[in-house]
Amino acid sequence: MNQTQATFPSPTDVVSLATAKEHLRVEHSDEDTLITTFIGVAYDHVQAYTNTHLAETEVAHYFDHLHEYTNIHVGPRVTINTDSGKGVSYVNADGVKTFLDAADYEFDGGSYPARLRILNEPIDVKDTVNAWQIDTKSGYNNTTRPDAL
């Protein structure tokens, strides 16, 4: 599996500069750049350590082949991104990217790892690297993010 992050939320959407300065008891703006850098580093570290997205993030996952149940290690609160030009797709025998209808797969984004099951697997999938692409949205928003994070 290969994945590419499509959106990069700002770490200060999760922890604001004002919140960090209050926590650090800093009342001046001389160190704002440094504190903002620390927020970004902490944000990246927590995401890597917990394997979660702290803010809603779009990610494209690529697979050579899909199994009966394909695990997608990203979270939390995963959904298939069905925005224009996104979803569950494959490269067909003619080399054309083809999207599956929602009726052709089941997706469990509430579990970890998230699971995808193809119900009606197409017969014209090209035997190539990254033949399958699954576009997801995952992560917390301001109302669902646990206080501990």
Where are the model-predicted features located?
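Divalent metal-cofactor coordination and adjacent catalytic microenvironments
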Residues: 1-149
